[in-house]
Amino acid sequence: MSKTTLFHALLVLLSNHSGFAGDWPQFRGPTGQGHADIKNLPLRWSATEKIIWKKKLPGTAWSSPVLGGNKLFLTNAVPDGEGVSLRALRVDALTGNVDWDLELFRMESAQRIHRKNSHASPTPFLDDDRLYVHFGNQGTACLSLAGKTIWKKRFDYPPVHGSGCSPVVEGDLLLFSADGARDPALYALDKHTGKTRWRTARDAAAKKKF
């Protein structure tokens, strides 16, 4: 999708409408390797063939959806006047109906990012009955699967190209990197409370150009 696209189109390509072979809870799947234990996937499709449903959503997001049961969860960044609304959504994977669509953070003015990035690029992490979403320096949040905000946290650091780091859960920790223009670091938050458990500096400055 080009950066001039004014909607986020979510296509579900399924050969069997009755169910799913397994959850897809994080970036690149259950193990983070991009492998799926699914057989008989469709090898061909077109604008009409093998499309169960198609949904257009306003905004632009490079994040991937995550799947738990028959529910899809995704993030979005929707322009709103001079600002940007940073949102999380739950979509029924069988019908395409939007169950809920919540604003979690708001940018009063759109910060500068790389022209190929979006303000909602990190993929959410689905951990049992909790959803973790990350918008870089704009904020990190934990939600129930019903859309209730459990906690929100924000680390104020100057981005260079915008965020692209998808968070991961390991034990009781939510992990992500914060690679900004100064003091880049790896953060570990208590996944239950959002409190910082530790912060480790990274000796890796983000390049101004690439």
Regions found by a protein language model. Give the residues of each.
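Bacterial N-terminal signal peptides
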Residues: 8-18
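Noncatalytic, solvent-exposed loop/strand surfaces
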Residues: 20-210
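Positively charged n-region of N-terminal signal peptides that target proteins for export
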Residues: 1-5
